[in-house]
Curated annotation (Swiss-Prot):
Gene: tufA
Start and end residues of each stretch annotated as G3: 81-84
Ligand binding (Mg(2+)): 26
UniProt-annotated stretches for the region G4: 136-139
Main location: plastid
Name assigned to this protein: Elongation factor Tu, chloroplastic
Entry keyword annotation includes ATP-binding: no
Binding residues annotated for GTP, in chain numbering: 19-26, 81-85, 136-139
tr-type G domain mapped to chain residues: 10-214
Compartment(s) of residence: Plastid, Chloroplast
Molecular function via GO: GTP binding; GTPase activity; translation elongation factor activity
């Protein structure tokens, strides 16, 4: 059977459910697919289908994530849901599932819980730009004043983590009662069941409140170099995948990282042995560089639009350290530890200068399984920017994953 072609007729958005364990994230994911299936815009997925999330690897870390897709009238969504709390932490730090927005699920019966706060904090740190709240289990709260108090508490919590708590849409409802209604009658239309209507209302809010993101092709050009070849009579070719932006033959780019930044002109572009006029984000290309010798270029450098990225050696980061069971270290480590930091296409040795916990208290050591903030100094400058992901490796195996919070130097 021929594979279906992916038709791009609507804007595409990546979204996910976040929140405390047992507050109803997976049930809500099922309810959304079922409610939208009833409107003819998606395929229904049962709770069991979503909950048995397959394992996937991102930056050497195994994560369980369920991916579902659905459509509203205006948009196509790819939705991620993780079964376990550790999976969320790993997912968000590794950027395995980049989110343009998130639906924060909070049980109206419990209000914000420790993991609710941890997920909001993580969303802020790793750059999830927008959150919409689903106040689940509304049917378990008889008192409307109590419901208002929980909503206020959620808004306050979001504001504490620098999200616009006063403006964020908060939609009460019951994922379970929606799923039950849709299981009995999969063809329910708007106006026939109040619980299903609340799910449709949630998706209307997601449609309007979460903006369509700037796509990678519209950003400043950047390509991490994976390999360098010398072609007799033509010059030096750098190969790699265009991470963002677009590039045309004749444009000027900078070579950034590991050595002094140099400027060069692109004299040719090739993909699958054919020459191109222009390369776009996602393309694997060979780039012919004018006036550059093979030994001027090495794996780990980047080609970028001039003055859009700089080489740095010191940064602050949020990291997750793998447990022994996940293939990580068996013992704690201390300040001064010198692992390799794998950034884009290369390993660079770095020294961990200091650790702090979420509330910025100093920490003495880091145990396998910890999530911690750390300041790092690399022995060589490389192209780094806020929000960039990296892996921490030791002797070729991954022992942690991180995201850059800020550049120090």
């Amino acid at each position: 059977m021929a594979r279906q072609k992916f038709e791009r007729t609507k804007p595409h958005i990546n979204i996910g459910t976040i929140g405390h364990v047992d507050h109803g994230k997976t049930t809500l994911t099922a309810a959304i697919t079922m409610a939208l299936a009833a409107t003819g815009n998606s395929k229904a997925k049962r709770y069991e289908d979503i909950d048995s999330a397959p394992e996937e690897k991102a930056r050497g870390i195994t994560i369980n994530t369920a991916h579902v897709e659905y459509e509203t009238k205006n948009r196509h969504y790819a939705h991620v849901d993780c079964p376990g709390h550790a999976d969320y932490v790993k997912n968000m730090i590794t950027g395995a599932a980049q989110m343009d927005g998130a639906i924060l699920v909070v049980s109206a019966a419990d209000g914000p819980m420790p993991q609710t706060k941890e997920h909001i904090l993580l969303a802020k740190q790793v750059g999830v730009p927008n959150i919409v709240v689903f106040l689940n289990k509304e049917d378990q709260v008889d008192d409307s004043e109590l419901l208002e108090l929980v909503e206020l508490e959620i808004r306050e919590t979001l504001s504490n983590y620098e999200f616009p708590g006063d403006d964020i849409p908060v939609i009460p409802g019951s994922a379970l009662l929606s799923v039950e209604a849709l299981t009995k009658n999969p063809k329910i239309t708007k106006g026939e069941n109040k619980w299903v209507d609340k799910i449709l209302n949630l998706m209307d809010q997601v449609d309007s409140y979460i903006p369509t993101p700037t796509r990678d092709t519209e950003k400043d050009f950047l390509m991490a170099i994976e390999d360098v070849l010398s072609i007799t009579g033509r010059g030096t070719v750098a190969t790699g995948r265009v991470e963002r932006g677009t590039i045309k033959v004749g444009e000027t780019v900078e070579l950034v990282g590991l050595k002094d930044t140099r400027s060069t002109t692109i004299t040719g572009l090739e993909m699958f042995q054919k020459s191109l006029d222009e390369a776009l984000a996602g393309d694997n290309v060979g780039v012919l560089l004018r006036g550059i010798q093979k030994n001027d270029v090495e794996r780990g450098m980047v080609l970028a639009k001039p003055r859009t990225i700089n080489p740095h050696t010191k940064f602050d980061s949020q990291v997750y350290i793998l447990t022994k069971e996940e293939g990580g270290r068996h013992t704690p480590f201390f300040e001064g530890y010198r692992p390799q930091f794998y950034v884009r296409t290369t390993d660079v040795t770095g020294k961990i200068e200091s650790f702090r916990s979420d509330n910025d208290n100093p920490a003495q050591m880091v145990m396998p399984g910890d999530r911690i903030k750390m300041k790092v100094e690399l022995i060589q400058p490389i192209a780094i920017e806020k929000g960039m992901r990296f892996a921490i490796r030791e002797g070729g195996r991954t022992v942690g994953a991180g995201v850059v919070l800020s550049i120090i130097q």
